[in-house]
A protein has these predicted regions:
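Glycoside hydrolase catalytic-domain context in secreted enzymes
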Residues: 1-270
C-alpha cells in the first residue's frame, strides 16, 4: 500500500511518520463499524493544516460554537478535500443474511476504500456476544451465536485483507458484553462458558482469517483486567491460537506494566 505521509482526515489514530525515510511507513487507523469513519469534507489551510468541517463524533455537535470553530475547518475554504466512503450494513444486519460470501465482499469493498485513502488498520469488526439486550452496541456485533460470530468476522477479515497493506482489528477481546461501566466491570465466567461462548468467535476468526490486529477490552475477566492478562493475551491468543499480529488496547487503557509485558501497540481509540 506504499508509504503513508498523510493522515486521512477523521482517522482515529496514527503512528509517527518520522521514520519514513528509513523505510518504516506510519500506520493510519480508522474507526468503523459501518465502513470507514472519516471526514467527508475537510478544509486545507494555507499552512497545510487539515481539519474536518463537520463533526464525525456525535458529542461534538453540542460543543460551544467558539470551541467548534477551533476544532473544525472552514466550510467556505477555497481548498477543500473530499473523502467519500460507503456506509455498509452493520454487523447484526450482515449476520442476519447468513451469507458469508456477501460478508467477504463487503470486507473487500472496505479494504479497497482503505487502500484509496491510506488507511492501514480498520478498527472493526466488533464481535462481542449479544448477552444483554440493553447493550448499546449490540448493533455493531453479529449475534448471540459464537459460531455465526466467528464465521462472519473471519469472512470480513478475509475480504479486507485481500487488499495489500490493509488489516482489520477484531474487538473487543473479550467478555465486553455491556457498555454500562465497561471500563471497570468484572465479568465472572467459568472456563466452559468462557471457551464455548465468549472466546469461541475470536478463536474461529483468528484461526480462519489471520487478522492483523486484535483490540483488548477495558473490563476485567474473573478479577483481572484483560490488558494485564498474560493468560488471555499470550497463552490463549498467541500460544494456543497462533495469533501473530498486533494486540492494541482500547482508548487509553494501557498501563505502564502492560506496555512492558504484553502490548506491541498502544491504541487510543474505540
Amino acid at each position: 500500500s506504499g508509504h503513508r505521509f498523510f493522515e486521512a482526515p477523521g482517522a482515529a489514530g496514527v503512528t509517527t511518520g518520522n521514520l519514513t525515510a528509513k523505510g518504516i511507513p506510519n500506520v493510519v487507523m480508522a474507526d468503523g463499524p459501518a465502513g470507514l469513519r472519516l471526514h467527508k469534507i475537510s478544509s486545507v489551510s494555507i499552512t497545510g493544516k487539515v481539519k474536518g468541517v463537520e463533526p464525525n463524533i456525535s458529542f461534538m455537535k453540542y460543543l460551544p460554537e467558539p470551541v467548534k470553530k477551533v476544532m473544525l475547518g472552514n466550510p467556505n475554504s477555497k481548498n477543500l478535500l473530499y473523502q467519500f466512503t460507503t456506509a455498509f450494513p452493520v454487523g447484526i444486519s450482515l449476520a442476519s443474511s447468513w451469507n458469508l460470501q456477501l460478508a467477504e465482499e463487503v470486507g473487500n469493498a472496505v479494504g479497497k476504500e482503505m487502500e484509496a485513502y491510506g488507511v492501514t488498520y480498520w478498527l472493526a469488526p466488533g464481535m462481542n456476544i449479544h448477552r444483554n439486550p440493553l447493550c448499546g452496541r449490540n448493533f455493531e456485533y453479529f449475534s448471540e451465536d459464537p459460531l455465526l460470530t466467528g464465521k462472519f468476522a473471519a469472512a470480513i477479515t478475509k475480504g479486507v485483507q485481500k487488499n495489500r497493506g490493509c488489516y482489520v482489528t477484531l474487538k473487543h477481546y473479550c467478555c465486553n458484553n455491556q457498555e454500562d461501566n465497561r471500563n471497570k466491570t468484572n465479568a465472572n465466567v467459568n472456563e466452559r462458558a468462557l471457551r464455548e461462548i465468549y472466546l469461541k468467535g475470536f478463536e474461529i476468526a483468528v484461526k480462519e482469517s489471520h487478522p492483523g490486529a486484535v483490540m483488548s477490552s477495558y473490563n476485567k475477566v474473573n478479577g483481572k483486567y484483560v490488558n494485564n492478562s498474560y493468560r488471555l493475551l499470550t497463552q490463549v491468543l498467541r500460544n494456543e491460537w497462533g495469533f501473530d499480529g498486533f494486540v492494541m488496547t482500547d482508548w487509553f487503557a494501557t498501563g505502564e506494566n502492560t506496555v512492558i509485558r504484553h502490548m506491541r501497540l498502544h491504541q487510543a481509540t474505540t
